[in-house]
């Protein structure tokens, strides 16, 4: 398969690009230049790998979920344990890389957006480590849902700005973070949390997250002597999925499945299934599939999981959908909750609600596969942050 994206202008087919105001163009170009240089620099790579190993705790295990496999009665199910990273999710793979980039560029301050709070915590963590000032924008609704993570960020020395505009969720936090970056661009680096935003952000985040798929490939081959038949990951903006999928894109015998949040159901208005129900538009500096009405107004995304309710999706996922290399599906709040409970009871692993969407789809897929086939789920984060809201949800039902 001939796949080489993005092109030099940052496009993935028709998607991606740089839809930014003139005031940001210089910074985006400066970032691209610095990133290219860093990727060629052995000392930078060495420092990054040092922190990934000794600070983040990589490599993360590829765990054979024997009980879950028996329960499903089909393919062997493996879990890529990104929940075991420092800070409890895949997010830190990217924040550590970008924070080192910020230091390299001579920036003193970092700004970021966060939904579930995981990216905010991972950003505040690396800022504490590297002595950078940290400002995090978070939607008012998410601040309410994720009080513990807000406290964590503040403990780590970050300033958390609550955003009341719009629906008070991730999209609004990104708007404010971008605004802040425009006016502080001389001394501030923006750590985008997913494969979104203007080029080179989707590429930078994908590349830093690709450690997930690269490790998985090596680990699976060592265990089974071949590549897995299927790989499953959840998708909000899509960074854990992109990090998992990208190293497998050329291996056409490996089926790739991206799982979005169907919320209350894709037939309702309450979902975040952008690739299932969206249409093409521009948001936050990039062309991608979006949830929008006929007038092009962005619609609110809904999911029980704060990390999946973004109304867009990374430009590279948009392309991978169009060319059919990845097959995208959606899972409802109910199905995700069932999977959350099942994995917890069967394996003693409490997954994040985001990751539970991937688990839920894998539970449908595994029984349709042969017993000698293998399926890998990207377990993108741990569920500690969700236990409280799940308890509330179950009491209400």
From Swiss-Prot:
Keywords: Amino-acid biosynthesis, Aromatic amino acid biosynthesis, Lyase, Pyridoxal phosphate, Tryptophan biosynthesis. Its cofactor is pyridoxal 5'-phosphate. It catalyses: (1S,2R)-1-C-(indol-3-yl)glycerol 3-phosphate + L-serine = D-glyceraldehyde 3-phosphate + L-tryptophan + H2O. It is an enzyme of class 4 (lyase). The keyword Lyase applies. SUPFAM superfamilies: Tryptophan synthase beta subunit-like PLP-dependent enzymes (SSF53686). GO terms for molecular function: tryptophan synthase activity. Pfam families: PALP (PF00291). Its EC number is 4.2.1.20. It comes from the Bacteria. Belongs to the TrpB family. The beta subunit is responsible for the synthesis of L-tryptophan from indole and L-serine. This is Tryptophan synthase beta chain. It comes from Bacillus cereus (strain B4264).
């Amino acid at each position: 398969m001939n796949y080489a994206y993005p092109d030099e202008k940052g496009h993935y087919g028709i998607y991606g690009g740089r839809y930014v105001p003139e005031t940001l163009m210089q910074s985006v170009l400066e970032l691209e230049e610095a990133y290219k240089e860093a990727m060629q620099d052995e000392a930078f790579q060495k420092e990054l790998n040092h922190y990934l190993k000794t600070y983040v705790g990589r490599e993360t295990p590829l765990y054979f979920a024997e009980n879950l496999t028996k329960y499903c009665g089909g393919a062997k199910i493996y879990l890529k344990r990104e929940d075991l990273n420092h800070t409890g999710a895949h997010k830190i793979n990217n924040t550590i890389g970008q924070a080192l980039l910020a230091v390299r560029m001579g920036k003193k301050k970092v700004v970021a957006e966060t939904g579930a709070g995981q990216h905010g915590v991972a950003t505040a963590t690396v800022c504490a480590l590297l002595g950078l000032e940290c400002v995090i924008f978070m939607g008012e609704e998410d601040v309410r849902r994720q009080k513990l993570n807000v406290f964590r960020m503040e403990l780590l020395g970050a300033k958390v700005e609550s955003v009341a505009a719009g629906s008070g969720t991730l999209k609004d936090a990104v708007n404010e973070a971008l605004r802040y970056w425009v006016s502080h661009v001389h001394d501030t680096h923006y750590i985008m949390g997913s494969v979104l935003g203007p080029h080179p952000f989707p590429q930078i985040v994908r590349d830093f997250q690709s450690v997930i798929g690269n490790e998985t490939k090596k680990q699976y081959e060592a265990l089974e002597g071949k590549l897995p038949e299927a790989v499953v990951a959840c998708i909000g903006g899509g960074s854990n999925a992109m990090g998992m999928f990208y190293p497998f894109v050329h291996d056409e015998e490996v089926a790739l499945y991206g799982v979005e949040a169907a919320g209350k159901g894709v037939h309702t208005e309450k979902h975040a299934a952008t690739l299932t129900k969206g249409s093409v538009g521009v948001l936050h500096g990039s062309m991608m599939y979006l949830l929008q009405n006929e007038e092009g107004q962005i619609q609110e995304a809904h999911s029980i999981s704060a990390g999946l309710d973004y109304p867009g999706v990374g430009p590279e996922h948009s392309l991978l959908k169009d060319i059919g290399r990845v097959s995208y599906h959606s899972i409802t709040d109910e199905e995700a909750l069932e999977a959350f409970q099942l994995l917890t009871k069967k394996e003693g692993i409490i997954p994040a609600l985001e990751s539970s969407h991937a688990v839920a789809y894998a539970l449908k897929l595994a029984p349709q596969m042969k017993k000698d086939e293998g399926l890998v789920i990207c377990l993108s984060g741990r569920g500690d942050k969700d236990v409280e809201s799940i308890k509330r949800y179950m009491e209400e039902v």
